[in-house]
């Protein structure tokens, strides 16, 4: 008979798997509670960092239909459940792991499939959504400015031509006199 607290834990983890856009599995062996708190703060509001027993996580993953992660659930396991954009959380995990060698990124789950450590790091290397939108807006503005200059060029050219003809006529009339 399963204990109610374990059933609740499995249900909670399964729900997190279902509601998260991504999950990153880590090993936290050797991290102090203070470091774990620091990591949770670095991850931000959209990410929940949950330490759990491997057997409970395996059951929750199975219950959620998450496959391909069983080999990651070895040793002290904690999972970062990411709701929203995974880039910022992946960056925070990568930076924290760089500064704290005790945190090891094992892999993750995103878009219905397992992802490797290198894929998590690739996600961390991407620009955030806001930065990408800013770059796109800048590129669009530059193209609009180019288009405006292109459309204004014939009118400017015609005005210069008219001014040159006017000067030529005025110069020609003064020579004829």
Curated annotation (Swiss-Prot):
Keyword Transport set for record: no
Molecular function terms from GO: large ribosomal subunit rRNA binding
Keyword DNA damage: no
Any GO CC annotation of this UniProt entry: ribosome
Record keywords: Ribonucleoprotein, Ribosomal protein, RNA-binding, rRNA-binding
SUPFAM superfamilies according to UniProt: Ribosomal protein L10-like
One GO BP: translation
Pfam families cross-referenced by the UniProt entry: Ribosomal_L10 (PF00466)
UniProt xrefs under InterPro entries: Ribosomal_uL10, Ribosomal_uL10-like_sf, Ribosomal_uL10_bac, Ribosomal_uL10_bac_type
Secretion signal, residue range per the UniProt entry: none
Subunit structure as annotated in this protein's UniProt entry: Part of the ribosomal stalk of the 50S ribosomal subunit. The N-terminus interacts with L11 and the large rRNA to form the base of the stalk. The C-terminus forms an elongated spine to which L12 dimers bind in a sequential fashion forming a multimeric L10(L12)X complex.
UniProt similarity note: Belongs to the universal ribosomal protein uL10 family.
Function (record text): Forms part of the ribosomal stalk, playing a central role in the interaction of the ribosome with GTP-bound translation factors.
Name this protein carries in UniProt: Large ribosomal subunit protein uL10
Gene encoding the protein: rplJ
């Amino acid at each position: 008979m399963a204990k109610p607290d374990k059933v609740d834990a499995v249900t909670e983890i399964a729900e997190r798997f279902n509601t998260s856009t991504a999950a990153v599995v880590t090993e936290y062996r050797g991290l102090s509670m203070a470091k774990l708190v620091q990591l949770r703060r670095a991850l931000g509001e959209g990410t929940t960092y949950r330490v759990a027993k491997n057997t409970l996580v395996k059951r929750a993953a199975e219950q959620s239909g998450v496959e391909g992660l069983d080999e990651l659930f070895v040793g002290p396991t904690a999972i970062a459940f990411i709701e929203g954009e995974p880039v910022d959380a992946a960056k925070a995990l990568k930076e924290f792991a760089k500064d704290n060698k005790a945190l090891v990124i094992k892999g993750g789950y995103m878009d219905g499939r397992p992802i490797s450590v290198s894929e998590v790091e690739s996600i961390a290397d991407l620009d955030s959504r806001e930065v990408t939108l800013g770059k796109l807006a800048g590129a669009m503005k530059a193209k609009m400015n180019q288009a405006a200059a292109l459309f204004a060029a014939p009118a400017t050219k015609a005005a210069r031509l008219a001014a040159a003809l006017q000067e030529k006529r005025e110069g020609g009339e003064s020579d004829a006199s």
